[in-house]
Amino acid sequence: MERIKELRDLMSQSRTREILTRTTVDHMAIIKKYTSGRQEKNPALRMKWMMAMKYPITADKRIIETIPERNEQGQTLWSRTSDAGSDRVMVSPLAVTWWNRNGPTASTVHYPKVYRTYFEKVERLKHGTFGPVHFRNHVKIRRRVDINPGHADLSAKEAQDVIMEVVFPNEVGARILTSESQLMITKEKKEELQECKISPLMVAYMLERELVRKTRFLPVAGGTSSVYIEVLHLTQGACWEQLYTPGGEVRNDDVGQSLIIAARSIVRRATVSADPLASLLEMCHSTQIGGVRMVDILRQNPTEEQAVDICKAAMGLRISSSFSFGGFTFKRTSGSSTKKEEEVLTGNLQTLKIRVHEGYEEFTMVGKRATAILRKATRRLVQLIVSGRDEQSIAEAIIVAMVFSQEDCMIKAVRGDLNFVNRANQRLNPMHQLLRHFQKDAKILFQNWGIEPIDNVMGMIGVLPDLTPSTEMSMRGVRISKMGVDEYSSTERVVVSIDRFLRVRDQQGNVLLSPEEVSETQGTEKLTITYSSSMMWEVNGPESVLVNTYQWIIRNWETVKIQWSQDPTMLYNKMEFEPFQSLVPKAARGQYSGFVRTLFQQMRDVLGTFDTVQIIKLLPFAAAPPKQSRMQFSSLTVNVRGSGMRILIRGNSPVFNYNKGTKRLTVLGKDAGALNEDPDEGTTGVESAVLRGFLILGREDRRYGPALSINELSSLAKGEKANVLIGQGDVVLVMKRKRDSSILTDSQTATKRIRMAIN
């Protein structure tokens, strides 16, 4: 108090005021504090002090030519004294105003291109609709979300290379643009930004926004795609939320959504094939999403979802260390356990072998619609605190936690036998057996669990076996909370291994993911997914299988034709014919196959009966294991459009229609491609034309290796002999002429010789 009084007295004296306002500061410590280092110690004060001066800005001397000395009001815009210590001119802030009003105007054509993300945001907000505001206490949980809509998915390093190449193409430094997306973006941006006068640094910043995914760990209730996150401050507060529908979609959200759908389809399909891992990789490598290879997206996109993570693990990429069970992501937050095999008896006296986790552990469980904290000991649930959107979601979380706890009363609650199978008809492991059982009906589980009286704890209430909330009693150890559990925030990724059956394990051998965890939910992808693998033809139904099978034969006709005559068994075993078998009535498969194979053998034996169209038409039927029978067929049945449709052995049908005039094939009315050669063109035409320069020596001679296709003949050296397959499926021996002079007569001789060789 004394000090304050003393200060007041001092301030009342005019000399004190003068010392403080007029005299210079000459205490070395103070001068040091404010002048050492290049960092401004008090930017706000510095700005005020500078702007109070008449000429606070310095500019290049050229400014004198472009700005008048005085403005319309006669105020001086720049000083004739140059800046101390440099040859720059001192300029008044009024000069900036003059420049903004009267200075040269540049082309604005590049602004929407450089500031694309801002322009697009304005459009989305313009077309978005804001609904009513609701005041309520909502459960927000922190999730890792994407905060800049409309970006590509490049890694920071890839983006840096693209930005350097676009903005500073002449700078030194090794830049390697490898991925397809890098090259595409670089080309597009270079074209867009020709003659661009916007400062390169600004362009670089804006490009970074466009190319790299930026994520933040934010409290969210509701939509997590980037078009919702950009308006988070408008749609949810501490105790209110406002409904909002975005006025547009952005590619990065669509990529994530479509990636999940593609990955789920691929994992589901791979599970039922003979070698799930090999099939999964083949499909990932041959699939495109929105025109970009799926493997490129998997490498760059941080989307975390069970099927996506299985695909990433198969490609040898790192994934999150959390594990999945019952559609919930579990992350162990404390404790540890050891695993031990144990046999237990269900309520139906069925023996199950389960891997028991011995020890005390705590987990967070995060699902789409519910989150929970789980504390468990060996085969005992200690505490479960759940929060969720509705009763159904809360029930799902409770069931998963009860099964995960491996408690005896849960196993004893099983009624009936457990015999759930996966898509490949293999029995599920015991933990998933139990899970499926109680997901179907959890009534007995909840009733057998036991209830207990509860204390009154802020923000927590009990839940009874019929899922009604209560403040007095609750299922043992289970409580409902208003607060959500935050998603696991770390972006740490770990090395994992994957086995043939797509089970993903961490380096300690814990199973993180398996195909049982992949959701069965079907959605409609936002971007076009193109599955080139024959394994995925059936995704779009029987018609797609039919059309794709025939398109594949036509596309690969040159090699198919050679295999047909030389190594038919290998051809029949091709995986491309697998999906087709599901269209052929089960009872008829073997007989059709036997019949077609016999027919083909006759074509090979009886020269001149080769028939391109018929081979293409019947080939898929020959792929099934054949049954020997004397049966003859005039048509073969395929199950499409909900009923059996016929393919005629001789002639066209709605299923398989070949137009001789246009040489095009239509399957179920869809174009399946053009055939290279007309089966009826006799021996002249194509062969004789192509065989110019070759001498036909006679029938096939096996010593000269397998038959080449006509296109492969060009690689022969002069005088070299080879077997060649000609249009009728016949193989002849030819020799490349040593001289070129007689080429003209070759085509006539060839025609005669082929006839002789065949007859």
Curated annotation (Swiss-Prot):
Cross-referenced Pfam families: Flu_PB2_1st (PF20947), Flu_PB2_2nd (PF20948), Flu_PB2_3rd (PF20949), Flu_PB2_4th (PF20950), Flu_PB2_5th (PF00604), Flu_PB2_6th (PF20951), Flu_PB2_7th (PF20952)
UniProt keyword terms in alphabetical order: Cap snatching, Eukaryotic host gene expression shutoff by virus, Eukaryotic host transcription shutoff by virus, Host gene expression shutoff by virus, Host mitochondrion, Host nucleus, Host-virus interaction, Inhibition of host innate immune response by virus, Inhibition of host MAVS by virus, Inhibition of host RLR pathway by virus, Inhibition of host RNA polymerase II by virus, mRNA capping, mRNA processing, Viral immunoevasion, Viral transcription, Virion
SUPFAM superfamilies tied to this protein: PB2 C-terminal domain-like (SSF160453)
Subcellular location: Virion; Host nucleus; Host mitochondrion
Any single biological process term in GO: cap snatching
Motif Nuclear localization signal per UniProt: ranges: 736-739
GO CC annotations, alphabetized: host cell mitochondrion; host cell nucleus; virion component
Gene Ontology molecular function, alphabetical: RNA binding; RNA-directed RNA polymerase activity
Keyword Signal: no
Sites marked Mammalian adaptation: K627
Xref: Gene3D superfamilies: Polymerase Basic Protein 2, C-terminal domain (3.30.30.90)
Summary of subunit composition and partner proteins: Influenza RNA polymerase is composed of three subunits: PB1, PB2 and PA. Interacts (via N-terminus) with PB1 (via C-terminus). Interacts with nucleoprotein NP (via N-terminus). Interacts (via N-terminus) with host MAVS (via N-terminus); this interaction inhibits host innate immune response.
Main function: Plays an essential role in transcription initiation and cap-stealing mechanism, in which cellular capped pre-mRNAs are used to generate primers for viral transcription. Recognizes and binds the 7-methylguanosine-containing cap of the target pre-RNA which is subsequently cleaved after 10-13 nucleotides by the viral protein PA. Plays a role in the initiation of the viral genome replication and modulates the activity of the ribonucleoprotein (RNP) complex.
Protein family (similarity comment): Belongs to the influenza viruses PB2 family.
Protein name, as recorded: Polymerase basic protein 2
